[in-house]
Amino acid sequence: SGSGGAAGADYIIAQGTTGKWMWRKWASGIAEMWATFDAPSLTMTSQTWGPLYTASWMGLEVNKQAREYPFAFIENPIVSATPTVGSGNIWLATNTENDIGTRLTHAPAYQCVRGSDAIVDSPQISYYVVGRYK
């Protein structure tokens, strides 16, 4: 086979950085974008969800605004969110009280959850979003 790629291969028609988001638009109508949201630390010392400890920085206005996508999708995109921390184990749960916009225009908010109290060091939520923009 040749080095020119397969017939009908998709290709990037635009890419850039908007706020926290890096993004690519593909000729086929698919778009992908990714961003990270972090905090220096997160205090999780109160049981806020039954026996579980939860906390989030997604309610901060700066984070609400930054979760707006650089452009809207035309159908609900696939959103992957991955937590990482400097120390203190967590998992993620939805945080709908801090959602704004729609699934087409904004990344969803998440909260950090754990089974015991802690101050979590350097929590970060990394988003990867893919869907149709046209």
Regions found by a protein language model. Give the residues of each.
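Extracellular attachment/recognition segments
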Residues: 28-134
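Glycine-rich, low-complexity segments
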Residues: 1-42
